Amino acid sequence: MPVTINGNGSITGLSVGGLGSGVVNTASIADGAVTTDKASGSVKGIEMVDQWRITSTKSNSGQSVFDSNWERNDLNSNKIGSAGMSESSGVFTFPTTGKYLVIAFGYATGNNDRYMGIWIERTADGSNWTRGAEGYGSAYNSGSNTFSQVSIQYFFHVTNTSTHKIRLKSDNVGTCNWDGAQDIMRTGFTFIRMGDA
């Protein structure tokens, strides 16, 4: 079929892939002609944001995984995107592959504790856990109910949602309380999908 340029400016007879290399450049593409299906990496923008917290205070000494009492922050409909994170026994699963910024934060009270910290732990095989980030505060004071706040970040490249997972762990020299609540963010996670894997 011959290629025909019609009087109204339309073209008929042109097959898919029929234009040679360099015929169409970026400047000639209409502003609304590129869909997210054709975009890649961070060009799509942020596609997912999700925030989770513990709902009750966790009291422990030494190292301990935050394995219960998690809920999504439901006060401000904070989840962006159709699919957010899922959680089971403190282990968080990502909805899709991609590059994620993981932010963990903890609010603790202690009594003469030299250090109280949190770790972002990651696994790439679903079973072996290693530290991705850690941060510490201190409640080294002779009085009781000394407060400490810790915030850490980790950039996680998720290539397999079945094996790449995240969890939160505490590390304290003595017994301290990591505060949780149902109506305010005190101890928990924020997950932001920054781009494609």
Language-model segments: which ranges?
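Short, functional N-terminal and low-complexity linear motifs
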Residues: M1, N6, R131-G135
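Glycine-rich, low-complexity segments
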Residues: P2-N69, M194-A197
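Extracellular jelly-roll beta-sandwich "head" domains, especially the C-terminal globular C1q domain
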Residues: K44-A197
